[in-house]
Structures are given as structure tokens and as C-alpha cells.
Amino acid sequence: LIDHDPQGSSAQWLDARTKNLPSIYSVAAYRKDDNHTTRSFQLMVPIDTTHIIIDTPAGVSGNVLSDHLRHCDLILMPVVPSVIDIRAATGFIKDVLLSPGFRIKPKPIAVIANRVKRNTLGYNKLEAFLNSLNIPFITTIRDTQQYVRAAEFGMGIFDFTQPNEKDREEWQPLINW
């Protein structure tokens, strides 16, 4: 898990993770190392790594965005049901599609509706927006206390000994994608 977001939420989530859960290697990429190591060395992951998730801050653009796009296999963008997030997502999608890093080597891109309360005006607007894109709208993730609990203990939904079946069902389209 490579965390480029200065907020450090991903790194904090991992710090809360207990040793009995599967280990996840973390790189705090938002920190600049002062001990005279190269950036490449700082971002190095173990050789047996099979999957990498890159967490970027909202609003990343320009050369930084292009660099991230060159180092990824796919782009997954969570969007919450708010007019502000919908506008930000519109700009981000435009930036991705016009980025040299994407135009040189296009990658699969998809969106998910995140922290959703169904049957609300905000969700209806978000769903209409996501369905209007020429980009796959993979799934809708509900806003539940299960995610609050998971975040507190550095867990994912599938780490619970008795995960909520509805939560698992919501994640399945994303896993299949």
C-alpha cells in the first residue's frame, strides 16, 4: 500500500492493524526521506509483492498525476454522493483522460459510489452522474458502521470473522472487475 496522501490515512489504518491479520507492506510516500536515499529506494516494495494499491490525494493533477498513471495497471475512483465530489470527479476524469501518462498507455478506469445512503437525493444525483459517464460504474458501497469499526482496527470488510453478507455482496463486482 503506497500512500501518497499527506493526510496519511492509509498509513494510520495500517498502524491500527493487529499482527493476527494478514500483513500488508506500507510505503509512506508522502514523507520525503532525509537520510540520503533515492526516491526509488524509498518507494521500493518487497520482491514477492503481487498487488500494489496507490492511494493519492484528491485533486492530484499535472506531472504528478501523469507519473502515477505510468505506474499503475488500473484506475479506481471512489465518489461520494455530494455535488462537490461530483464536480471534483468530473475534473479528475478529464485530467486523467488528457494526461500524457494515460494517453501514451491507456489503463482501465472505473468508478464506485462510496459511503452511500440509498434513497436520498444525493445518491440519486450521484447515480445519474456515474451512469452518464462512458466509464464503468462498478458498484455502490453503503455508508455503514461496519466500515467505521474496520477503520478503527485496521481491518477490511473481509477480515471480520463474521462479515456482513450485504457488505461482501457489494464488494463482489469490484473483485470481479
Model-assigned labels for residue ranges:
Residues 87-107, 114:
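Conserved C-terminal guanine-recognition region of P-loop GTPase G domains, centered on the G4
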Residues 1-62, 151-152:
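P-loop/Walker-type NTP enzyme "switch/lid" segment
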